[in-house]
Protein backbone atom coordinates (compact mmCIF):
# COMPACT_ATOMS: atom_id res chain seq x y z
CA UNK A 1 0.00 0.00 0.00
CA UNK A 2 1.40 3.29 -1.07
CA UNK A 3 2.33 5.62 1.64
CA UNK A 4 1.64 9.28 0.73
CA UNK A 5 0.06 12.36 2.15
CA UNK A 6 -2.19 15.09 0.53
CA UNK A 7 -1.86 18.61 1.70
CA UNK A 8 -4.48 21.26 0.60
CA UNK A 9 -3.71 24.92 0.89
CA UNK A 10 -7.33 26.03 0.21
CA UNK A 11 -8.98 28.31 2.68
CA UNK A 12 -12.70 28.42 3.38
CA UNK A 13 -14.25 31.75 2.40
CA UNK A 14 -18.01 31.97 2.90
CA UNK A 15 -20.22 34.21 0.66
CA UNK A 16 -20.45 37.74 1.84
CA UNK A 17 -23.83 39.24 2.63
CA UNK A 18 -23.56 41.49 -0.43
CA UNK A 19 -22.87 38.52 -2.70
CA UNK A 20 -25.79 36.57 -1.30
CA UNK A 21 -28.03 39.66 -1.68
CA UNK A 22 -27.25 40.32 -5.35
CA UNK A 23 -29.61 37.70 -6.86
CA UNK A 24 -32.40 38.91 -4.60
CA UNK A 25 -31.71 42.51 -5.56
CA UNK A 26 -31.77 41.64 -9.25
CA UNK A 27 -35.06 39.80 -8.82
CA UNK A 28 -36.55 42.61 -6.77
CA UNK A 29 -35.39 45.25 -9.23
CA UNK A 30 -36.92 43.46 -12.20
CA UNK A 31 -40.08 42.77 -10.20
CA UNK A 32 -40.38 46.43 -9.30
CA UNK A 33 -39.69 47.46 -12.89
CA UNK A 34 -42.50 45.29 -14.18
CA UNK A 35 -44.81 46.39 -11.37
CA UNK A 36 -44.04 50.07 -12.00
CA UNK A 37 -44.52 49.57 -15.74
CA UNK A 38 -47.94 48.10 -15.18
CA UNK A 39 -48.78 50.84 -12.69
CA UNK A 40 -47.75 53.52 -15.15
CA UNK A 41 -49.86 51.95 -17.90
CA UNK A 42 -52.78 51.77 -15.49
CA UNK A 43 -52.43 55.42 -14.49
CA UNK A 44 -52.36 56.53 -18.12
CA UNK A 45 -55.28 54.34 -19.07
CA UNK A 46 -57.41 55.48 -16.13
CA UNK A 47 -57.42 59.01 -17.53
CA UNK A 48 -59.51 57.81 -20.46
CA UNK A 49 -62.19 56.33 -18.24
CA UNK A 50 -63.41 59.91 -17.75
CA UNK A 51 -63.02 60.73 -21.45
CA UNK A 52 -64.81 57.72 -22.93
CA UNK A 53 -68.53 57.63 -22.23
CA UNK A 54 -70.25 54.26 -22.17
CA UNK A 55 -73.41 55.70 -23.75
CA UNK A 56 -71.97 57.99 -26.44
CA UNK A 57 -68.66 56.16 -27.08
CA UNK A 58 -69.52 52.46 -26.59
CA UNK A 59 -66.68 51.09 -28.73
CA UNK A 60 -63.99 53.30 -27.21
CA UNK A 61 -65.29 52.58 -23.72
CA UNK A 62 -65.35 48.81 -24.33
CA UNK A 63 -61.80 48.91 -25.71
CA UNK A 64 -60.60 50.85 -22.68
CA UNK A 65 -62.47 48.59 -20.26
CA UNK A 66 -61.00 45.41 -21.76
CA UNK A 67 -57.51 46.83 -21.58
CA UNK A 68 -58.03 47.98 -17.99
CA UNK A 69 -59.31 44.53 -16.93
CA UNK A 70 -56.42 42.69 -18.63
CA UNK A 71 -53.91 45.04 -17.03
CA UNK A 72 -55.44 44.39 -13.60
CA UNK A 73 -55.21 40.63 -14.22
CA UNK A 74 -51.52 40.92 -15.10
CA UNK A 75 -50.86 42.90 -11.92
CA UNK A 76 -52.72 40.31 -9.82
CA UNK A 77 -50.72 37.47 -11.42
CA UNK A 78 -47.47 39.26 -10.64
CA UNK A 79 -48.52 39.74 -7.04
CA UNK A 80 -49.51 36.07 -6.56
CA UNK A 81 -46.95 34.18 -8.67
CA UNK A 82 -44.03 36.55 -8.55
CA UNK A 83 -41.65 37.21 -11.39
CA UNK A 84 -42.01 34.69 -14.20
CA UNK A 85 -41.27 34.66 -17.93
CA UNK A 86 -45.03 35.10 -18.43
CA UNK A 87 -45.08 38.30 -16.39
CA UNK A 88 -42.21 39.71 -18.42
CA UNK A 89 -44.01 38.91 -21.66
CA UNK A 90 -47.23 40.28 -20.21
CA UNK A 91 -45.71 43.72 -19.69
CA UNK A 92 -44.40 43.74 -23.26
CA UNK A 93 -47.84 42.79 -24.58
CA UNK A 94 -49.60 45.45 -22.50
CA UNK A 95 -47.22 48.15 -23.78
CA UNK A 96 -47.92 47.08 -27.34
CA UNK A 97 -51.66 47.06 -26.74
CA UNK A 98 -51.49 50.53 -25.14
CA UNK A 99 -50.19 51.92 -28.43
CA UNK A 100 -52.86 50.18 -30.49
CA UNK A 101 -55.86 50.46 -28.16
CA UNK A 102 -55.45 53.43 -25.79
CA UNK A 103 -53.45 55.91 -27.89
CA UNK A 104 -56.23 56.10 -30.54
CA UNK A 105 -58.68 57.11 -27.79
CA UNK A 106 -56.26 59.83 -26.68
CA UNK A 107 -55.80 61.07 -30.24
CA UNK A 108 -59.57 61.12 -30.84
CA UNK A 109 -60.11 63.14 -27.66
CA UNK A 110 -57.43 65.67 -28.66
CA UNK A 111 -58.88 65.90 -32.18
CA UNK A 112 -62.35 66.64 -30.82
CA UNK A 113 -60.97 69.41 -28.61
CA UNK A 114 -59.11 70.87 -31.61
CA UNK A 115 -62.36 70.94 -33.60
CA UNK A 116 -64.19 72.63 -30.70
CA UNK A 117 -61.50 75.33 -30.54
CA UNK A 118 -61.53 75.70 -34.32
CA UNK A 119 -65.31 76.20 -34.39
CA UNK A 120 -65.09 78.79 -31.61
CA UNK A 121 -62.38 80.67 -33.51
CA UNK A 122 -64.32 80.60 -36.80
CA UNK A 123 -67.49 81.83 -35.12
CA UNK A 124 -65.54 84.70 -33.58
CA UNK A 125 -64.54 85.70 -37.12
CA UNK A 126 -68.01 85.12 -38.61
CA UNK A 127 -70.89 85.08 -36.13
CA UNK A 128 -73.29 83.91 -38.87
CA UNK A 129 -71.41 80.65 -39.46
CA UNK A 130 -73.61 77.55 -39.37
CA UNK A 131 -72.32 74.04 -38.55
CA UNK A 132 -74.03 70.75 -39.34
CA UNK A 133 -73.26 69.79 -35.75
CA UNK A 134 -71.26 71.19 -32.82
CA UNK A 135 -67.82 69.60 -32.59
CA UNK A 136 -68.45 68.87 -28.92
CA UNK A 137 -71.12 66.34 -29.93
CA UNK A 138 -68.74 64.21 -32.02
CA UNK A 139 -68.21 60.81 -30.43
CA UNK A 140 -64.78 59.32 -29.86
CA UNK A 141 -65.91 56.26 -31.82
CA UNK A 142 -66.49 58.41 -34.91
CA UNK A 143 -63.09 60.08 -34.64
CA UNK A 144 -61.29 56.77 -34.02
CA UNK A 145 -62.79 55.26 -37.16
CA UNK A 146 -62.27 58.48 -39.15
CA UNK A 147 -59.57 60.76 -37.68
CA UNK A 148 -60.05 63.25 -40.56
CA UNK A 149 -63.74 63.76 -39.71
CA UNK A 150 -64.71 67.45 -39.53
CA UNK A 151 -68.17 69.10 -39.26
CA UNK A 152 -69.45 70.91 -42.34
CA UNK A 153 -70.00 74.66 -42.18
CA UNK A 154 -71.61 77.42 -44.21
CA UNK A 155 -71.71 81.16 -43.69
CA UNK A 156 -75.09 82.80 -43.19
CA UNK A 157 -73.58 86.06 -44.43
CA UNK A 158 -72.51 84.29 -47.64
CA UNK A 159 -76.03 82.94 -48.09
CA UNK A 160 -77.42 86.44 -47.69
CA UNK A 161 -74.89 87.81 -50.16
CA UNK A 162 -75.65 85.10 -52.75
CA UNK A 163 -79.38 85.78 -52.52
CA UNK A 164 -78.72 89.53 -52.57
CA UNK A 165 -76.70 89.32 -55.78
CA UNK A 166 -79.32 87.18 -57.50
CA UNK A 167 -82.14 89.42 -56.26
CA UNK A 168 -80.37 92.58 -57.40
CA UNK A 169 -79.85 91.17 -60.88
CA UNK A 170 -83.45 90.03 -61.01
CA UNK A 171 -84.77 93.44 -59.98
CA UNK A 172 -83.19 95.03 -63.03
CA UNK A 173 -84.82 92.57 -65.41
CA UNK A 174 -88.30 91.51 -64.36
CA UNK A 175 -90.14 94.51 -62.91
CA UNK A 176 -90.74 98.15 -63.81
CA UNK A 177 -93.35 100.14 -61.92
CA UNK A 178 -94.79 103.44 -63.22
CA UNK A 179 -94.14 106.70 -61.46
CA UNK A 180 -96.69 107.24 -58.74
CA UNK A 181 -97.36 109.24 -55.60
CA UNK A 182 -97.32 107.60 -52.26
CA UNK A 183 -97.17 108.79 -48.68
CA UNK A 184 -94.39 107.49 -46.47
CA UNK A 185 -92.82 108.24 -43.14
CA UNK A 186 -96.16 108.70 -41.41
CA UNK A 187 -96.98 111.75 -43.58
CA UNK A 188 -93.66 113.44 -42.82
CA UNK A 189 -92.82 113.73 -46.52
CA UNK A 190 -94.65 113.33 -49.79
CA UNK A 191 -92.40 111.76 -52.39
CA UNK A 192 -92.52 111.13 -56.09
CA UNK A 193 -91.24 107.61 -56.65
CA UNK A 194 -90.07 105.83 -59.76
CA UNK A 195 -89.51 102.22 -58.75
CA UNK A 196 -87.56 99.68 -60.80
CA UNK A 197 -87.68 96.31 -59.07
CA UNK A 198 -89.75 94.83 -56.25
CA UNK A 199 -91.69 96.89 -53.73
CA UNK A 200 -90.70 96.72 -50.04
CA UNK A 201 -94.07 95.12 -49.23
CA UNK A 202 -93.27 92.24 -51.57
CA UNK A 203 -89.85 91.77 -50.04
CA UNK A 204 -91.35 91.79 -46.55
CA UNK A 205 -93.76 89.01 -47.55
CA UNK A 206 -90.87 86.86 -48.79
CA UNK A 207 -88.72 87.62 -45.72
CA UNK A 208 -91.60 86.54 -43.48
CA UNK A 209 -92.10 83.38 -45.59
CA UNK A 210 -95.65 84.41 -46.40
CA UNK A 211 -97.34 81.81 -48.66
CA UNK A 212 -98.53 84.68 -50.86
CA UNK A 213 -94.98 85.95 -51.42
CA UNK A 214 -93.58 86.19 -54.94
CA UNK A 215 -92.62 82.70 -56.18
CA UNK A 216 -89.70 84.28 -58.01
CA UNK A 217 -88.24 85.62 -54.76
CA UNK A 218 -88.96 82.37 -52.96
CA UNK A 219 -87.20 80.51 -55.76
CA UNK A 220 -84.04 82.58 -55.30
CA UNK A 221 -83.96 81.66 -51.60
CA UNK A 222 -84.64 77.97 -52.28
CA UNK A 223 -81.85 77.83 -54.88
CA UNK A 224 -79.31 79.39 -52.51
CA UNK A 225 -80.21 77.18 -49.55
CA UNK A 226 -80.38 74.10 -51.77
CA UNK A 227 -76.93 74.67 -53.26
CA UNK A 228 -75.44 75.16 -49.79
CA UNK A 229 -76.14 71.52 -48.88
CA UNK A 230 -77.60 72.52 -45.51
CA UNK A 231 -80.76 70.51 -46.18
CA UNK A 232 -78.67 67.35 -46.06
CA UNK A 233 -77.62 68.12 -42.47
CA UNK A 234 -81.06 66.97 -41.26
CA UNK A 235 -81.26 69.69 -38.61
CA UNK A 236 -84.48 71.69 -38.81
CA UNK A 237 -83.27 74.42 -36.46
CA UNK A 238 -80.10 75.04 -38.49
CA UNK A 239 -82.11 74.94 -41.72
CA UNK A 240 -84.51 77.60 -40.41
CA UNK A 241 -81.58 79.83 -39.47
CA UNK A 242 -80.14 79.37 -42.97
CA UNK A 243 -83.45 80.48 -44.49
CA UNK A 244 -83.48 83.55 -42.22
CA UNK A 245 -80.02 84.59 -43.40
CA UNK A 246 -80.85 83.88 -47.04
CA UNK A 247 -84.08 85.91 -46.97
CA UNK A 248 -82.23 89.00 -45.70
CA UNK A 249 -80.51 89.19 -49.08
CA UNK A 250 -83.88 89.73 -50.76
CA UNK A 251 -83.79 93.40 -49.78
CA UNK A 252 -81.40 93.89 -52.69
CA UNK A 253 -84.35 93.17 -55.00
CA UNK A 254 -85.86 96.55 -54.11
CA UNK A 255 -85.43 98.56 -57.27
CA UNK A 256 -83.61 101.83 -57.77
CA UNK A 257 -85.80 104.63 -56.48
CA UNK A 258 -85.61 108.30 -57.37
CA UNK A 259 -87.11 110.78 -54.92
CA UNK A 260 -88.32 114.34 -55.27
CA UNK A 261 -89.02 115.44 -51.74
CA UNK A 262 -91.63 118.03 -50.76
CA UNK A 263 -91.89 118.82 -47.08
CA UNK A 264 -95.29 118.49 -45.44
CA UNK A 265 -95.21 121.69 -43.39
CA UNK A 266 -98.25 120.87 -41.29
CA UNK A 267 -96.72 117.59 -40.22
CA UNK A 268 -93.33 119.18 -39.59
CA UNK A 269 -94.87 121.81 -37.30
CA UNK A 270 -96.85 119.23 -35.29
CA UNK A 271 -93.85 116.92 -35.01
CA UNK A 272 -91.57 119.74 -33.88
CA UNK A 273 -94.06 120.64 -31.15
CA UNK A 274 -94.20 117.04 -29.90
CA UNK A 275 -90.42 116.64 -29.94
CA UNK A 276 -89.91 119.97 -28.17
CA UNK A 277 -92.40 118.98 -25.47
CA UNK A 278 -90.78 115.58 -25.07
CA UNK A 279 -87.27 117.00 -24.68
CA UNK A 280 -88.32 119.85 -22.41
CA UNK A 281 -90.29 117.67 -20.02
CA UNK A 282 -88.18 114.55 -20.60
CA UNK A 283 -91.44 112.81 -21.39
CA UNK A 284 -91.61 109.54 -23.21
CA UNK A 285 -92.59 108.77 -26.77
CA UNK A 286 -95.64 106.90 -27.98
CA UNK A 287 -97.20 105.21 -24.92
CA UNK A 288 -97.74 101.44 -24.92
CA UNK A 289 -99.02 98.93 -22.41
CA UNK A 290 -95.90 96.80 -22.74
CA UNK A 291 -93.07 99.23 -23.52
CA UNK A 292 -92.17 102.89 -23.65
CA UNK A 293 -89.99 104.77 -26.13
CA UNK A 294 -87.65 107.24 -24.45
CA UNK A 295 -86.15 110.01 -26.62
CA UNK A 296 -82.40 110.33 -26.61
CA UNK A 297 -81.10 113.68 -25.43
CA UNK A 298 -77.54 113.32 -26.69
CA UNK A 299 -76.08 116.25 -28.57
CA UNK A 300 -74.37 113.79 -30.91
CA UNK A 301 -77.74 112.51 -32.14
CA UNK A 302 -78.93 116.00 -33.08
CA UNK A 303 -75.58 116.73 -34.69
CA UNK A 304 -75.75 113.58 -36.80
CA UNK A 305 -79.25 114.40 -38.07
CA UNK A 306 -78.17 117.94 -38.94
CA UNK A 307 -75.15 116.62 -40.85
CA UNK A 308 -77.34 114.20 -42.80
CA UNK A 309 -79.75 116.96 -43.82
CA UNK A 310 -76.88 119.26 -44.81
CA UNK A 311 -75.29 116.52 -46.91
CA UNK A 312 -78.61 115.69 -48.60
CA UNK A 313 -79.23 119.35 -49.39
CA UNK A 314 -75.72 119.63 -50.86
CA UNK A 315 -76.23 116.57 -53.11
CA UNK A 316 -79.60 117.88 -54.31
CA UNK A 317 -78.08 121.28 -55.11
CA UNK A 318 -75.22 119.60 -56.95
CA UNK A 319 -77.61 117.53 -59.04
CA UNK A 320 -79.66 120.61 -59.89
CA UNK A 321 -76.51 122.54 -60.85
CA UNK A 322 -73.68 120.13 -61.85
CA UNK A 323 -71.38 123.04 -62.75
CA UNK A 324 -70.92 123.63 -59.00
CA UNK A 325 -68.42 120.77 -58.99
CA UNK A 326 -65.89 122.85 -60.94
CA UNK A 327 -66.18 126.04 -58.88
CA UNK A 328 -62.83 127.18 -57.51
CA UNK A 329 -61.91 129.37 -54.57
CA UNK A 330 -58.59 130.84 -53.54
CA UNK A 331 -56.98 129.94 -50.26
CA UNK A 332 -53.89 131.31 -48.59
CA UNK A 333 -51.10 129.17 -47.24
CA UNK A 334 -49.46 131.29 -44.49
CA UNK A 335 -46.25 129.26 -44.71
CA UNK A 336 -44.02 128.97 -41.67
CA UNK A 337 -41.58 131.35 -39.96
CA UNK A 338 -37.83 130.74 -40.03
CA UNK A 339 -35.44 131.45 -37.17
CA UNK A 340 -34.77 134.81 -38.78
CA UNK A 341 -38.43 135.87 -38.55
CA UNK A 342 -39.14 135.48 -42.27
CA UNK A 343 -42.15 133.46 -43.54
CA UNK A 344 -41.40 130.95 -46.29
CA UNK A 345 -43.52 128.47 -48.22
CA UNK A 346 -46.62 130.66 -48.23
CA UNK A 347 -48.77 131.71 -51.14
CA UNK A 348 -52.17 131.60 -52.78
CA UNK A 349 -53.57 128.37 -54.20
CA UNK A 350 -56.91 127.29 -55.70
CA UNK A 351 -59.18 124.46 -54.58
CA UNK A 352 -62.55 123.02 -55.60
CA UNK A 353 -64.47 122.87 -52.29
CA UNK A 354 -67.59 121.24 -53.73
CA UNK A 355 -65.54 118.52 -55.40
CA UNK A 356 -63.68 117.92 -52.12
CA UNK A 357 -66.90 117.69 -50.13
CA UNK A 358 -68.44 115.30 -52.65
CA UNK A 359 -65.40 113.02 -52.40
CA UNK A 360 -65.67 113.06 -48.60
CA UNK A 361 -69.35 112.08 -48.72
CA UNK A 362 -68.70 109.35 -51.32
CA UNK A 363 -65.93 107.95 -49.13
CA UNK A 364 -68.10 108.19 -46.01
CA UNK A 365 -70.86 106.09 -47.58
CA UNK A 366 -68.50 103.85 -49.58
CA UNK A 367 -70.15 104.79 -52.89
CA UNK A 368 -67.14 103.79 -54.98
CA UNK A 369 -68.96 104.13 -58.30
CA UNK A 370 -70.07 107.67 -57.42
CA UNK A 371 -73.72 106.95 -58.30
CA UNK A 372 -75.53 110.15 -57.29
CA UNK A 373 -78.95 108.47 -57.31
CA UNK A 374 -77.82 105.85 -54.83
CA UNK A 375 -76.03 108.44 -52.72
CA UNK A 376 -79.15 110.60 -52.43
CA UNK A 377 -81.26 107.53 -51.64
CA UNK A 378 -78.80 106.50 -48.94
CA UNK A 379 -78.94 109.91 -47.27
CA UNK A 380 -82.74 109.96 -47.40
CA UNK A 381 -82.87 106.44 -45.95
CA UNK A 382 -80.60 107.44 -43.06
CA UNK A 383 -82.69 110.54 -42.33
CA UNK A 384 -85.89 108.52 -42.29
CA UNK A 385 -84.32 105.84 -40.09
CA UNK A 386 -83.04 108.44 -37.62
CA UNK A 387 -86.64 108.93 -36.48
CA UNK A 388 -86.49 105.39 -35.08
CA UNK A 389 -82.87 105.50 -33.95
CA UNK A 390 -83.49 108.65 -31.87
CA UNK A 391 -85.38 106.60 -29.27
CA UNK A 392 -84.49 103.91 -26.73
CA UNK A 393 -87.17 101.30 -26.11
CA UNK A 394 -87.82 99.92 -22.62
CA UNK A 395 -90.24 97.10 -21.68
CA UNK A 396 -92.63 97.96 -18.84
CA UNK A 397 -91.40 95.24 -16.48
CA UNK A 398 -91.58 96.08 -12.78
CA UNK A 399 -89.88 92.99 -11.31
CA UNK A 400 -86.31 93.81 -12.28
CA UNK A 401 -84.96 90.93 -10.20
CA UNK A 402 -86.48 88.49 -12.69
CA UNK A 403 -84.62 90.16 -15.56
CA UNK A 404 -81.38 90.01 -13.65
CA UNK A 405 -81.94 86.39 -12.58
CA UNK A 406 -82.66 85.02 -16.06
CA UNK A 407 -79.83 86.85 -17.83
CA UNK A 408 -77.32 86.14 -15.06
CA UNK A 409 -78.08 82.40 -15.00
CA UNK A 410 -77.88 82.16 -18.79
CA UNK A 411 -74.63 84.17 -18.86
CA UNK A 412 -73.08 81.85 -16.26
CA UNK A 413 -74.18 78.74 -18.15
CA UNK A 414 -72.89 80.09 -21.45
CA UNK A 415 -69.64 81.29 -19.87
CA UNK A 416 -68.93 77.93 -18.25
CA UNK A 417 -69.58 76.09 -21.52
CA UNK A 418 -67.96 78.41 -24.08
CA UNK A 419 -65.85 80.95 -22.13
CA UNK A 420 -68.14 83.64 -23.58
CA UNK A 421 -70.75 85.12 -21.22
CA UNK A 422 -72.72 86.84 -23.99
CA UNK A 423 -72.20 90.20 -22.25
CA UNK A 424 -70.08 93.03 -23.66
CA UNK A 425 -68.92 96.35 -22.27
CA UNK A 426 -70.84 99.41 -23.46
CA UNK A 427 -68.03 101.68 -24.61
CA UNK A 428 -68.98 105.15 -25.89
CA UNK A 429 -72.41 103.84 -26.94
CA UNK A 430 -70.78 100.98 -28.85
CA UNK A 431 -70.39 97.26 -28.24
CA UNK A 432 -67.00 96.85 -26.56
CA UNK A 433 -64.88 94.00 -25.18
CA UNK A 434 -66.44 90.76 -23.88
CA UNK A 435 -67.14 90.69 -20.13
CA UNK A 436 -65.44 87.79 -18.35
CA UNK A 437 -67.36 85.35 -16.19
CA UNK A 438 -65.62 86.53 -13.02
CA UNK A 439 -66.79 90.11 -13.62
CA UNK A 440 -70.47 89.62 -14.47
CA UNK A 441 -71.64 90.21 -10.88
CA UNK A 442 -70.88 93.93 -11.41
CA UNK A 443 -73.78 94.05 -13.86
CA UNK A 444 -76.36 92.28 -11.67
CA UNK A 445 -77.19 94.37 -8.63
CA UNK A 446 -80.86 93.43 -8.23
CA UNK A 447 -81.81 96.87 -9.52
CA UNK A 448 -81.72 96.08 -13.22
CA UNK A 449 -83.65 96.99 -16.34
CA UNK A 450 -83.20 96.22 -20.01
CA UNK A 451 -83.61 98.44 -23.04
CA UNK A 452 -83.19 98.30 -26.79
CA UNK A 453 -81.14 100.87 -28.68
CA UNK A 454 -81.41 100.38 -32.48
CA UNK A 455 -77.86 101.72 -32.83
CA UNK A 456 -76.35 99.32 -30.28
CA UNK A 457 -78.70 96.43 -29.50
CA UNK A 458 -80.09 95.03 -26.26
CA UNK A 459 -78.64 96.64 -23.12
CA UNK A 460 -78.84 95.71 -19.44
CA UNK A 461 -78.50 98.55 -16.94
CA UNK A 462 -77.48 97.93 -13.31
CA UNK A 463 -77.75 100.60 -10.61
CA UNK A 464 -75.94 100.51 -7.27
CA UNK A 465 -75.25 103.34 -4.83
CA UNK A 466 -76.58 105.84 -7.34
CA UNK A 467 -74.19 104.69 -10.09
CA UNK A 468 -75.28 102.84 -13.23
CA UNK A 469 -73.25 100.38 -15.29
CA UNK A 470 -74.46 99.10 -18.65
CA UNK A 471 -73.59 96.11 -20.81
CA UNK A 472 -74.63 94.97 -24.28
CA UNK A 473 -76.55 91.68 -24.23
CA UNK A 474 -76.17 88.93 -26.81
CA UNK A 475 -79.75 88.06 -27.87
CA UNK A 476 -78.91 84.43 -27.11
CA UNK A 477 -79.22 85.17 -23.38
CA UNK A 478 -82.96 85.80 -23.63
CA UNK A 479 -83.80 84.11 -26.92
CA UNK A 480 -85.88 81.04 -27.66
CA UNK A 481 -84.97 77.97 -29.72
CA UNK A 482 -86.09 79.72 -32.92
CA UNK A 483 -83.79 82.71 -32.20
CA UNK A 484 -86.78 85.06 -32.45
CA UNK A 485 -85.05 88.07 -30.84
CA UNK A 486 -81.95 87.73 -33.03
CA UNK A 487 -84.22 87.53 -36.07
CA UNK A 488 -86.18 90.63 -35.05
CA UNK A 489 -82.98 92.63 -34.48
CA UNK A 490 -81.51 91.51 -37.80
CA UNK A 491 -84.68 92.55 -39.65
CA UNK A 492 -84.75 95.91 -37.85
CA UNK A 493 -81.14 96.63 -38.83
CA UNK A 494 -81.76 95.73 -42.48
CA UNK A 495 -84.94 97.81 -42.64
CA UNK A 496 -83.32 100.86 -41.04
CA UNK A 497 -80.30 100.53 -43.30
CA UNK A 498 -82.65 100.72 -46.28
CA UNK A 499 -84.76 103.53 -44.82
CA UNK A 500 -87.94 101.54 -44.11
CA UNK A 501 -88.63 103.11 -40.75
CA UNK A 502 -92.34 102.21 -40.59
CA UNK A 503 -91.62 98.52 -41.15
CA UNK A 504 -88.70 98.69 -38.68
CA UNK A 505 -90.97 100.21 -36.04
CA UNK A 506 -93.39 97.31 -36.48
CA UNK A 507 -90.59 94.84 -35.82
CA UNK A 508 -89.54 96.81 -32.74
CA UNK A 509 -93.11 96.66 -31.46
CA UNK A 510 -93.20 92.89 -32.05
CA UNK A 511 -89.86 92.33 -30.35
CA UNK A 512 -90.74 94.44 -27.31
CA UNK A 513 -94.04 92.55 -26.98
CA UNK A 514 -92.07 89.29 -27.06
CA UNK A 515 -89.62 90.47 -24.37
CA UNK A 516 -92.41 91.83 -22.19
CA UNK A 517 -94.39 88.61 -22.58
CA UNK A 518 -91.38 86.47 -21.70
CA UNK A 519 -90.59 88.26 -18.43
CA UNK A 520 -94.20 89.00 -17.56
CA UNK A 521 -94.96 85.27 -17.79
CA UNK A 522 -92.09 84.61 -15.39
CA UNK A 523 -93.49 87.24 -13.03
CA UNK A 524 -96.92 85.58 -13.06
CA UNK A 525 -95.37 82.16 -12.39
CA UNK A 526 -93.37 83.59 -9.52
CA UNK A 527 -96.49 85.27 -8.11
CA UNK A 528 -98.47 82.03 -8.30
CA UNK A 529 -95.65 80.13 -6.59
CA UNK A 530 -95.46 82.70 -3.79
CA UNK A 531 -99.24 82.53 -3.32
CA UNK A 532 -99.14 78.75 -2.96
CA UNK A 533 -96.32 78.98 -0.44
CA UNK A 534 -98.35 81.40 1.65
From Swiss-Prot:
Principal location class: virion
GO biological process per UniProt: symbiont entry into host cell
Domain of life: Viruses
Record keyword DNA repair present: no
Compartments where found: Virion
The keyword Lyase appears for this protein: no
Signal peptide: none
GO cellular component, one term: virion component
Keywords assigned: Viral genome ejection through host cell envelope, Viral penetration into host cytoplasm, Virion, Virus entry into host cell
Oligomeric form and interacting partners: Homododecamer. Localizes inside the capsid.
Protein task: Protein that is stored in high quantity in the viral capsid and may play a role during ejection.
Name assigned to this protein: Cargo protein 2
The organism of origin for this protein: Bacteroides phage crAss001 (Bacteroides phage PhiCrAss001)
Amino acid sequence: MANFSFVSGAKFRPFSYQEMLQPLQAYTQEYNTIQEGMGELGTKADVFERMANEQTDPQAYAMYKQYSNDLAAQAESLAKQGLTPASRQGLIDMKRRYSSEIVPIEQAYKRRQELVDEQRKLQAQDSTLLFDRPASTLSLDELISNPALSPQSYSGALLSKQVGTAAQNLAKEVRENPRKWRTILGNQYYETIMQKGFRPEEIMQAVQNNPEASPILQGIVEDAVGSSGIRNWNDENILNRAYDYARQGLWNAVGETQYQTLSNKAYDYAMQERLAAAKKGKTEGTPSAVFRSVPKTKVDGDKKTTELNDELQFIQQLRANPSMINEEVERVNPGYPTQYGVNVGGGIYKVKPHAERLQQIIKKYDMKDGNMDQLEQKLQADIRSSAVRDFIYKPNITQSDLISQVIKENARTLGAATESTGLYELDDNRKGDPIKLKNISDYFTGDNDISYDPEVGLIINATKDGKTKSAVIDPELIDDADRSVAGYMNNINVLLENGYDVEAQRYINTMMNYIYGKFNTLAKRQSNTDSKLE
